Amino acid sequence: MTRSPNAARDARRERMLASPRFDGRVFRNTNIAKAGLKPGTVMPTMKEYICGGERRVPGAPIPLQDPRASWKQAPETGLRVTWLGHSTLVFEIDGARILTDPVWTQRASPVPFAGPKRFHAPPVPIASLPDLDAVLISHDHYDHLDRSAIRALRKRSTRCITSLGVGSHLEAWGIDPARITELDWWEATTLEPSGVVITATPSQHFSGRTLLDRNATAWSSFHLQGSKHAVFHGADTGLTPEYTQIRERFGKFDLVLLEIGAYHPAWGDIHLGPEHALDAHAMLGSGTLLPIHWGTFNLAMHAWDEPIETLSSLAPSRGVQLLTPMLGQAVEPARVGALMPWWRTVAAEERASGKSSWVPETSHDETAVSWPVD
């Protein structure tokens, strides 16, 4: 049954006004968090952006795997994940298949000719995705919500589950309001027939797609609970004490996904980076850690592989088991073996070729920004 767009809009507004995080105009974090550059850091940050010599893009092609053959068989353990790049993943958990933050566009940008460009093609065309039980969208930034991807998914009858307010974008792009479920923090919805429960949980971030809609919609992390497995998808966030609340509510996790890339010390409190990702993992209490939000777009000033190298060097001393699949590789966390450092092969090829960067069809400067846009 379709739902009137006007009725959906009115119901959304009513729910937003009832949210303790909405002040009548914008959504706010629970704790004070700065999304922009910290005071006194503008000029040093700009100098670093202009003069820094970091390898901000990979110096050789990133290896990809095609997951379609794997998807034809159910995961033997009941839990499998396929990282398609950045924060786009396919979860297969206890009979449900869920796509997160679908981005297939060439640039994480409002325009097709400028802005952060992909390091690699998506491992699989969006038209070749398998049947999905849900599309899960954390917030409305361009590197997490791609209009062309949503439009490509319109013909499917898949549910779209997202943060409060984000449904307005989906409706504008042709998604039937009846297919959209918007959640405020701690609200949940159940997928049928699997019974997998998805709960929106806190994150410390911000939202907006233009200069005029900053924080007009909400942002979330998510807890996925199946009959046998539990997954935490951190999406975009800074370090927040609310991770302890999440652990207290849900207990142990089989798999934890946390962002490690596109961070900078001057960027306030809205991204983790590798060290804070380990702190967040400790607060969450358990679970194999799959690092996301790196290796696809140049959204910061660090070397493209610095986040994963830092994480992999620190994780053993923190007792954290990492899962680092190749892009497109369908893996079951219960069967994780040794670290799979595929990014070092890229670095070795870069050194062998003598190239400092490999950026097809764009210049170095076109792919980076000196302030947080995601």
Residue ranges of predicted features:
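Metallo-beta-lactamase
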Residues: 1-128, 163-235, 254-260, 310-328, ...
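Cap/insert and terminal regions of metallo-dependent hydrolase folds
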Residues: 2-30, 118, 125-126, 134, ...
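Active-site-proximal loop/helix segment associated with metal-binding centers of metalloenzymes
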Residues: 48, 52, 104, 200-226, ...
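Catalytic core of the metallo-beta-lactamase
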Residues: 88-94, 190-253, 268-276
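Divalent metal-coordination and catalytic microenvironments
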Residues: 91, 101, 139, 146, ...
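Short hydrophobic/aromatic-enriched beta-strand-loop microsegments
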Residues: 100-101, 159-161, 177-185, 254-259
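Di-metal (Zn2+ and/or Mg2+/Mn2+) metal-binding site signature of metallo-dependent hydrolases
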Residues: 123-154, 164
